[in-house]
Amino acid sequence: VRVLINESIISHCCWNGNDEIIGFFGAEIDSLNYYRLSIESCNTEKLFFDARKYSDGHPTIVHNRYIISDTYPDKNRIKKLFVYDLVKNDYRELGLFYESMSFFSYSRCDLHPRISVDNRFLFVDSVHSGKRKLYFMRSGICE
């Protein structure tokens, strides 16, 4: 067992290939962001986002290039689903999902985006209909 990073806040990491992790972390609130972490060297590289705008989501990686993630509900109870292209430095919103106040704390429902093996479909959990359900849509990525 080896420590890779020793930040105060570490959250929602995912593999990017066999030697890199993409995660949301920082030493303090002002430094929170998405970072790329090398497993071999433990070096980090800050990625694209202003964390205050996109918040701590649940990232998944497609082809070591696209980060698909979500946000927590904003003050209007809207969660965003988005994709970020690491090569083009391009952000694109994929959807907005309302979550009523009846879903909060332990009953809240994060989107937890995940992609099908062939990258054609994107799956999310949502309560925008008033009940927790699994939804899917065409990903529009790598098609």
Indicate residue ranges for each PLM-predicted region.
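Beta-propeller blade signature
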Residues: 35-40, 80-88, 136-141
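Beta-strand initiation motifs
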Residues: 1, 41-45, 88-93, 142-143
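Short, solvent-exposed coil/turn segments at beta-strand boundaries
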Residues: 14-20, 39-41, 60-67, 115-120
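Beta-propeller domains
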Residues: 1-34, 44
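Conserved blade-ending motifs and adjacent loop-strand segments that build the rim/top face
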Residues: 5-10, 46-62, 89-115
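Long, low-complexity intrinsically disordered regions enriched in Ser/Thr/Pro/Gly
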Residues: 62, 69-71, 89, 99, ...
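Blade-level signature of beta-propeller repeat domains, shared across WD40, Kelch, NHL, RCC1
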Residues: 106-143
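Loop/turn-rich, solvent-exposed surfaces of beta-rich toroidal or solenoidal domains
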Residues: 16, 24, 29-32, 48-92
